């Protein structure tokens, strides 16, 4: 029998018979590992313990201690277990697909009756019975004709369609536990009992079109979440409860920040309070960019399709663009314009005006650019996913040798901005060259090394995401962590030699010849709308004083104090504090409650005692008790707190 060489993570290699499975490899190392093994990585591919290995490879055996692989398998197995439970409870239900998603999985079903909360309870109960039965998981490979015949005999038309889309010469993998089977790429655990029975929960039912196409049949999608332990599940459910309390849509209404309506789907109506947050954040970012050497520009929102065709975006983004047809005078045909879905091609147009020298580089062009993208109605979610948004967009035109320095400076700027906004921790992911790409390996080596060196230079932690870069260059993604532990991907840094080439950007080098600049796409917030939503939820509406839309309410206790209330408001406003008077004929406790719901950071209560002593009674949001202090002292303190940082 032919032999193959398997290399382990420690660098040691061993000879094995060709066709050996990872399960057999694990057992050959130790009885203990053979029992604990759940899957393997073979040349970087997640591999089922039952699959044969036919050639030399690098191998790593995974156990439940390997978080990423364990959770993927648990969630994948639960998708199958749920589908089996549904078909055992309601045999007429047809199954479709059930992938792993963030924190869990979903599965789409074709059923005439709507799944109810009681149905979800019954499904969960049956799932736990399947898990406790410890049914063995087995797998076979079939040819396409056999799989089609199998599913046609069972009336599983969705599965037939999936199989028909697979090339005729490709083997199809089938998985079983008990008498139930499904078409699946795998991998899976070895028996259903390896899934923790007390660490999952079915969450909700939603509508979903087959293959995401609204012209197809609408199915029912059941979502579930799963973790390795009961405690992790409880922590996640607690986080969801906290998230519901912090929902920016709920707080946005209470704080009178914004609204959305059917006549303008995905477009935000900013109210005075919300617009104040927006403008303050914009002023802050403008100041930070100016100090970092960026030049602010403004480019058109409506641009002819010719530019999008030249940039390559027409082919890739046309379906997500808002198009406008215009009949120009004396023109033979209508002009087709698009509301810009991104700013980068327009920034190249600004760069291209006038001859550039290497001495002009790096050139950093920034824009708070208004963009529009068509998002499906089902994907929109408050401020987090909209159709009209503004990016804190900037593009750096530079030489290859300048990439590392520009990247390091950007990471330091991003880190400082996030800290100012209350986010002390973030993750960096470096996405490297994909299989299909342009450019030489030497060029990719240089830019990937430049990004990695930049990260190391600033002392930041990072992970490498192999093969996930764009076809033209590597990128960095930045995920911040909010107050309840959620991750939000906001910042990006993308190296792009492609767009300058497509749109003719050039500079004169030291050698007197023309060269193409690199274009570095970068953003810190991502979009103002989404980031404001994140801020609202991170702070549960209790924004930092400098960012709060209504910073101070000066509330009278008696009407005789009204003139002094007006004086206090005027003194605060003169020092740049956003202050309002509340002289309504209401009890002070009522006023305090109302403004606390509106998340006003500071309430100054004014009665006759304060008038006579020229003091104010200070109440801070979320704190019990009050502090009495001289007016001048309080004005000075609040004026300092109101200053925009940076």
From Swiss-Prot:
Binding sites annotated in the UniProt record for Zn(2+): 344, 395, 521
Gene3D superfamilies on file: 3.10.20.30, 3.30.54.20, Anticodon-binding domain, Bira Bifunctional Protein, Domain 2, Threonyl-trna Synthetase, Chain A, domain 2
Compartments it resides in: Cytoplasm
Gene Ontology MF: a single term: tRNA binding
Record keywords: Aminoacyl-tRNA synthetase, ATP-binding, Cytoplasm, Ligase, Metal-binding, Nucleotide-binding, Protein biosynthesis, RNA-binding, tRNA-binding, Zinc
Keyword hit for Metal-binding: yes
Primary localisation category: cytoplasm
Names of required cofactors: Zn(2+)
Catalytic as annotated region, ranges: 247-544
Reaction(s) catalysed (UniProt annotation): tRNA(Thr) + L-threonine + ATP = L-threonyl-tRNA(Thr) + AMP + diphosphate + H(+)
A Pfam family hit: tRNA_SAD
Organism domain of life: Bacteria
Cofactor comment: Binds 1 zinc ion per subunit.
Enzyme type, top EC level: ligase
GO-annotated biological processes: threonyl-tRNA aminoacylation
Cellular component, GO, one term: cytoplasm
Subunit structure: Homodimer.
Family stated for the protein in its record: Belongs to the class-II aminoacyl-tRNA synthetase family.
Job description of the protein: Catalyzes the attachment of threonine to tRNA(Thr) in a two-step reaction: L-threonine is first activated by ATP to form Thr-AMP and then transferred to the acceptor end of tRNA(Thr). Also edits incorrectly charged L-seryl-tRNA(Thr).
Name of the protein described by the UniProt record: Threonine--tRNA ligase
UniProt organism field: Cereibacter sphaeroides (strain ATCC 17025 / ATH 2.4.3)
Gene name tied to this protein: thrS
